[in-house]
């Protein structure tokens, strides 16, 4: 880290993901200037991950790609996905954070999905497109996301990512507890 500057690379150009990373780091390191930059990073999984494991792997793949491209203090990747659990379909996001030689994985909250939405995803659509059609919105995935729509704005995609990032940062905030 340069003096009082933390450089963060986010494995996406999506402003929701970049803002979540910037907000989380500003909360965790208020004495530092946080320089956050997004970059396109391939996930190596389907555009709409349909399993927990594909979603997690997509975040890991994105963070590793970023590490190979540019120097930074921290690398963040967020991958949204869906799965059908015993209680029904839900969407969630995995967070992968790399700092030096350490990797931390976290996951955001689960948002239950209507069965009609899950069925459209099984048919090959992406969640953002399904939600845009259902709620007559445009490019919701770069705004409040399905979370914002289904919670009537009481939670957003960005707020979910921000909380998940803060939790996934625990090993970096307490390195002596995570050898």
UniProtKB/Swiss-Prot annotation:
Pfam families: NTPase_I-T
Keywords, sorted A to Z: Hydrolase, Magnesium, Manganese, Metal-binding, Nucleotide metabolism, Nucleotide-binding
GO molecular function: ITPase activity; metal ion binding; nucleotide binding; ribonucleoside triphosphate phosphatase activity
Primary enzyme class: hydrolase
Cofactors that this protein relies on: Mg(2+); Mn(2+)
Binding annotation for substrate: 71-72
Biological process, per Gene Ontology: nucleotide metabolic process; thiamine metabolic process
Keyword rRNA-binding: no
Known catalytic reactions: XTP + H2O = XDP + phosphate + H(+); ITP + H2O = IDP + phosphate + H(+)
Domain of life: Bacteria
SUPFAM superfamilies linked: ITPase-like (SSF52972)
Cofactor: how bound: Binds 1 divalent metal cation per subunit; can use either Mg(2+) or Mn(2+).
EC number: 3.6.1.73
Binding site for Mg(2+): 71
Assembly and oligomerization: Homodimer.
PANTHER family: NON-CANONICAL PURINE NTP PHOSPHATASE_PRRC1 DOMAIN-CONTAINING PROTEIN (PTHR34699:SF2), PTHR34699
Family of this protein: Belongs to the YjjX NTPase family.
Reported function: Phosphatase that hydrolyzes non-canonical purine nucleotides such as XTP and ITP to their respective diphosphate derivatives. Probably excludes non-canonical purines from DNA/RNA precursor pool, thus preventing their incorporation into DNA/RNA and avoiding chromosomal lesions.
Name of the molecule in the record: Inosine/xanthosine triphosphatase
Organism of this sequence: Shewanella sp. (strain MR-7)
Organism lineage string: Bacteria, Pseudomonadati, Pseudomonadota, Gammaproteobacteria, Alteromonadales
């Amino acid at each position: 880290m340069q003096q009082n500057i933390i450089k963060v690379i986010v494995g996406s150009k999506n402003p929701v993901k970049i803002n979540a990373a910037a907000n989380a780091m500003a909360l965790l390191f208020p004495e530092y200037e946080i320089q956050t930059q997004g970059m396109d990073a391939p996930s190596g999984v389907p555009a709409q991950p349909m399993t927990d494991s594909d979603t997690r792997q997509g975040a890991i793949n994105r963070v590793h790609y970023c590490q190979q491209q540019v120097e930074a203090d921290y690398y963040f990747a967020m991958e949204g996905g869906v799965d059908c659990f015993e209680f029904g379909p839900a969407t969630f996001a995995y967070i992968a954070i790399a700092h030096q030689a350490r990797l931390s994985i976290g996951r955001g909250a689960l948002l239950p999905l209507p069965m009609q939405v899950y069925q459209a995803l099984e048919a090959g659509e992406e969640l953002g497109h399904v939600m845009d059609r259902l709620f007559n919105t445009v490019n919701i995935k770069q705004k409040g996301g399905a979370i914002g729509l289904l919670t009537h704005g009481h939670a957003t995609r960005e707020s979910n990512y921000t909380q998940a990032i803060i939790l996934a940062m625990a090993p970096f905030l307490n390195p002596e507890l995570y050898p």
